[in-house]
Amino acid sequence: MSSSTSSSSPVKSTGLHVGAIKPGVAKKDPILVADGVRRQFGGLVAVEVEHVEIPRNAITALIGPNGAGKTTFFNLLTGFDQPNDGKWSFNGKSLAGVSAFKVARLGLIRTFQLTKALGLLTVMDNMKLGSTEQRGEKLSASLFPFLWKKKDAEIEDKALEILRRFKLDEKKDDFAASLSGGQRKLLEMARALMTNPELVMLDEPMAGVNPALTESLLEHILNLKQEGMTVLFVEHDMHMVRHIADWVIVMAEGKVVAEGAPDEVMKNPAVIDAYLGSHQDIDLGTVTGRVTLPTLPKEK
Amino acid sequence: MDFLGILSSSVSFILAPTTLAYALATLGLAVHFGFGGLLNMGMAGFMALGAYGYAIGVLTFGLPWYLAAFVGIGAAIVFALILGIPTLRLRGDYLAIVTIAAAEIVRLLLLSSAFGGVTGSADGLSGFNGPGGTITNPAEGAGGFDQSNPIPAGTYGFPPFLDNERIWYLRIVGAIILGLAIFIVWRLVNSPWGRVIKGIREDEDAVRSLGKNVFAYKMQALIIGGVLGALGGLMLAFSTNVNSSVYVTSLTFFLWTALLLGGAATVFGPLAGSIIFWVLQAFLGLLFPALAEVGLMPFSTIQASQIKFIIVGFALVLLVVFRPQGLFGNKKELTFVK
Amino acid sequence: MRTRSTMRRRIARLASALSAFALAFGALAIAAPAQADVVNAEMPFKVSGNVQNQGKPVAGVTVTLTGAAGYTATVATDADGKFVAGVPAKEADYTVTLDETTLPEGIAVIDNPATTFVEANVQTVTVGPGGRATMNFFIGQGERHTTSFVDQVVQRLISGLNFGLMLALASVGLSLIYGTTGISNFAHAELVTFGAVATFGLVALMGPGLLWLAIPIALILSAGLGWGLDAALWAPLRRRGMGLVQLMIVSIGLSLGIRYTYQFFIGGSTEQLPGSDAERFKLFGSVTLSITDIVSMGLSVILIVAFALWLSRTKIGKATRAISDNPSLAASSGIDVDGVVRIVWIIGSVLAGFSGILWAYFRPGIRWDMGGQILLLIFAATTLGGLGTAYGALVGSLIVGVLVEGSSLFIPSDLKYVGALVILIGILLFRPQGILGRKERVG
């Protein structure tokens, strides 16, 4: 059943860290650095990350049992939620207090666990929305088509090229609502590419995706790295993590409990503990990646 | 029973100033809700500010009518800003309750005797379209909206559009404003700006994650729709007196009915919806009492004249349940976000 | 033949003249099919007058009007010494009280020899069939008559509690419905009106002596209405999985339809229930209370306690709370969600209906849009307490009730609802979970 075995093994980036491997280890060339980021809901501490660095031009997986605070951490990093405490920076620029849309403009683009394809817009309009260069989006310019028509044609060409890669070009005039769940995931990723991002953060890109599509999704993620982008993704599918990730960060109960290359980190007792602590019914084999995990109830 | 007379009176509402006023305000709602997804239930407040701003501009500040009109529009913009800055981050149904409450506050302030000297309190304001001048100095009037009418006195047209020069002037001014408004809205929603606004309607977080300043776009939509609402109120004020009892919550609900009739995410739907709404209102409002009078309906004529409102209410229910895209909307492009 | 064609021409001319009339002058009338239908009671009639000090107008003097069973309005004189107040009914008596503390130092109302009243600053006017009445006050050197501030505060507080308890009956129902179905039910106002209108109809049918029987029957009819609306409309829409926004607009349409149906049957005037003119007796100082006030508050408390017991003790009550907390979890743990929601509609309608009967005594009077007048206050109370939490709605209602009644001590009484609406907006902005609600987790 596992779909990724058929593709040839991707080239892993190695030597990303500096010094001994431990949670919060420094990276040679970090793109994103978080320090003391804490988010509390009432009495519950959802995220408390002391220090973490995301390596540039590599694929990093963020894993952990349900309720570990992965999605909340994503929200905090991208400005969709504000932490009670802490600082974090992207390319050396502090993102504390920067609103979500400005974070996106800096080149840090995210997708959502529950896909947010804009259902009643066409696939092409979804793509065009990703572009950051259209001055016709300004109210003052929008009334004068001669100011934006040419740019719109350029954007459309670029969108078509990306859509072709994602095999969505035939659907370009359909409403996004008519796509399948997997196609919507693809569309969301394609749309993110329209913004020319530096760091792409994918929240469970494989969740709910038809097995027939997983392979192409994996390839697209690997392509991002080849094109010089950095990828950080949350995933429950350990098989996928082992297959494509260069680096793995493990979260449990809001904290980073382990880091390392995929094969090593899976053997780390802290990781096995974290998973066993919350899912004692799960066979250790699934955790270490020999079997695909059963579909777990999704984090809110 | 004079069926032809009833029909002709009803048809005359196609070009009535009130219909044009409704169409303008409904177009504003289309920008808010149909394209921007903003659940504005306080359109009556925007209309009231447009109408009262104009009337007060003439009567209290002694402005010429065309400058006073901008007082009304300016008041609506300020209202949109005050309302929007804190509320635009609220969930849809919360926004609905906040806007309805804000519009009621506007109405209660206009009704209160505390500001009666400026607003006329329960009596409302009148005489601002005439040669007028201010309340305190009626002599200095330089000529108001009525005096700007270039059409010579007389009766023009053919039945059922046989009317005097004032009505024709109102129609022409209204049609020009509405035509311009429809053109601008059409341009806007078919531009990249419109694409962003429609994206926000579908999922504002997704649009935010693509680097768009969602708040600014929503605010722009709120202001544009609010100005259209104020223009609707202005149109009502051009044609008659202003009174706070007009700008009640029901008015907003009637606008919503007209909007959903025509199709919320369409540019011409608001006009079509307003025409249908008013022609039907007039038709039923004349037909039922006439039927009651000749004994074909077992009610008093007063009761019969109220049936049309009952029909409006239940028609709104049926529309939302069975034809949410409106009479002219695209079935696929249902405007309701889940 | 000839006469007929002239007739037709004449009719045509008449019709076109009529339509022109409708266009030119009727726009206002047609654009205002509902007069002031929300929050502020319609006050079509007027009491006005002058306050003069030896022929010169006195501005800023507070004048309070009171009328049958609870009507009060406070207005101030303008620069010309004039005051105007709207009153709810014609052919009725109103007491006009001039607050002498608002007069300049050293002067008071001169005893008017034309009246037999001892206190010259308290006068009675009769609004005749014309709907207008005048009451002039003449000021000069003299002694003042004062109502102590404490008395006023106590009076407002009692009135506010009464109003708040009445609101609570309506808002706990709205809150339960919101909690279990997610509907912001605008038609709740019509459920409120229904109780009063049904009682009125039954009294007309059975005679005023059977009021004690009419009220329970009206409540049974309310229950039937709630059941019917859910069975015929809301349950099918729920099964279709209709979105919350659509449901809200459906409730708006329903509200308009039902409201005008009431108007169709009872007309546009204000009618009274038997006992609304009950005498007021003096509690202490100038604080007065009527027997209907006491009965009204007593019954509210009994009903609210019964409701709280139902919600906390019975199986269905517990199921209701479970659904409010987490509908899908409740459904998967074997609770019959549809059945419970049906019961919630029935109970919500009965409470709203009873609240309508009390509102008819408090306003006083029955009108086709009486529920709509307090709908936003009910929303405010529900929101203040935390949307979907029944106990919160109770607390919120009491706060809104006291606030609305108390605020007229400080601001003009025709603005007393504004305070509550401002609070509604403020709560939605800064603490949408209400004072008793829990904060939702984001993300």
Regions found by a protein language model. Give the residues of each.
Chain B
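Transmembrane alpha-helices and adjacent helix-loop boundaries
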Residues: 1-338
